[in-house]
Design a protein with these regions (language model features):
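Conserved, structured core segments of small domains
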Residues: 1-93
């Protein structure tokens, strides 16, 4: 299944940036495992966007629960499921 994860900042940018290196390490580790396919900070910096592939929502929720941003209380993740019909080639599905 494919998902868009919208990360909504719930703390000042200075607090977010203090945790950012650990967050990026978490994202990159799961990218190597094939979960996160693309990610970026939103512009203006009000949060982030992740494109994720996961067998199910529960698995993705567990990964997000271990994200340093979530553990640090600086983001609120919003998960949106979307159809893979038009993106299979783009994300290797």
């Amino acid at each position: 299944m494919l998902f868009v994860v919208l990360l909504h900042y719930t703390a000042p940018l200075s607090a977010v940036d203090a945790i950012r290196p650990a967050h990026l390490e978490h994202v990159e580790r799961h990218a190597r495992e094939g979960v996160f396919r693309a990610w970026a900070r939103r512009d203006p910096p009000a949060g982030g966007v992740l494109i994720a592939a996961s067998p199910n929502r529960e698995t993705l929720e567990a990964i997000l629960a271990r994200d340093p941003y979530v553990l640090g209380g600086v983001v609120r993740p919003e998960i949106v499921t979307f159809s893979e019909a038009n993106v299979r080639g783009l994300f290797g599905g």
